[in-house]
């Protein structure tokens, strides 16, 4: 999985204290003004620069030295997708959030940006009039800046631990007592053994449910490459926090990665093995009984956990169909979506696997499940596929 903040900065280490420095790069003066005002109103972040083109951002990056960049895709002189690799070449740990309107072309470019090292993307309102009243855009952007920036700070703290205090003069030095060294935990990291897991269900799973958010597209594409045997024999349903158009592109990427059929779910279609069903942007995906079959039910109701689609509606609806014969996986993402649904699955006799903190872009959703004590396993992304395959093959350990 490629993320923007892997590795060390070549332009100086990121600050471990003080507000996050945010560089805003957009050719719309209205958008720049709105984002500047929103960022400036937060106590833990500040506007480092407000620039009109990608070329300005590349040329001034060393002087500005931001922690986070909000980068528009369509700009004069140098567009966002062209500026992205140049910015990361100068500052490898820069967190870059791509901003684009909801067109198919921009969605495809956003996916390309993720593969080139962007940390995340955010859909931008179609017009400046919409932007000024875009509460969702405001909320989501600030949360992405905050959570992605916090992860950068934690990684920097681990990479550069505080210097030890100077040794006292020899006369004042205490007698030496040998003790095993204990590494200091990362900021906000959980101590080993602090998380408890429960046994996997003794019931054979009949369906695989997956929920994800920030960092999810990369994680999902990596995971489904390993799940061919499961997809062939069991239904696989995925909810990824994503807007319309973006989910269309994601489904196409999942089909290519898995080499199995994958598409946005359609209201009323039967749920069968052999394909991946993805919740479409802007709709909750549930499953319902339809005679002797199981069918998709799309829900245009209010957001759940600030999200639409949300993971909890899928998880809870599946219990009425498969009872405890459910394996659910919660991947990287902000917030706690999936935790309540995961609790219900466990109460019904099913199992939950969460992605671990080290391999998550943001350890919100999987962390909430892990801290709730509902997980049978908390694993790095590169171990989840093999575990899922074993569980569906009959291994309950």
Swiss-Prot record:
- The EC category is hydrolase
Documented EC number(s) = 3.1.1.61, 3.5.1.44
- Location of this chain's protein in the cell: Cytoplasm
User: Could you tell me which Gene3D superfamilies the record lists for this protein?
Assistant: 3.40.50.2300, Methylesterase CheB, C-terminal domain (3.40.50.180)
Q: Which residues carry this modification: 4-aspartylphosphate?
A: 72
Task: State the PROSITE patterns in the record.
Answer: CHEB, RESPONSE_REGULATORY
Q: Which reaction does it catalyse?
A: [protein]-L-glutamate 5-O-methyl ester + H2O = L-glutamyl-[protein] + methanol + H(+); L-glutaminyl-[protein] + H2O = L-glutamyl-[protein] + NH4(+)
Gene Ontology MF terms in the entry = phosphorelay response regulator activity; protein-glutamate methylesterase activity; protein-glutamine glutaminase activity
Q: Which residues form the active site?
A: 213, 241, 337
One Gene Ontology biological process = chemotaxis
Q: Does the keyword Nucleotide-binding apply?
A: no
Pfam families per record: CheB_methylest (PF01339), Response_reg (PF00072)
* Major subcellular location class: cytoplasm
Q: Which domain of life is it from?
A: Bacteria
**Mind listing the UniProt keywords for this protein, alphabetically?**
Chemotaxis, Cytoplasm, Hydrolase, Phosphoprotein
Show where the CheB-type methylesterase domain sits: 199-388
| Functional note | Involved in chemotaxis. Part of a chemotaxis signal transduction system that modulates chemotaxis in response to various stimuli. Catalyzes the demethylation of specific methylglutamate residues introduced into the chemoreceptors (methyl-accepting chemotaxis proteins or MCP) by CheR. Also mediates the irreversible deamidation of specific glutamine residues to glutamic acid.
PANTHER family in UniProt: PROTEIN-GLUTAMATE METHYLESTERASE/PROTEIN-GLUTAMINE GLUTAMINASE, PROTEIN-GLUTAMATE METHYLESTERASE_PROTEIN-GLUTAMINE GLUTAMINASE 1
UniProt family annotation? Belongs to the CheB family.
What name does this protein carry?
Answer: Protein-glutamate methylesterase/protein-glutamine glutaminase of group 2 operon
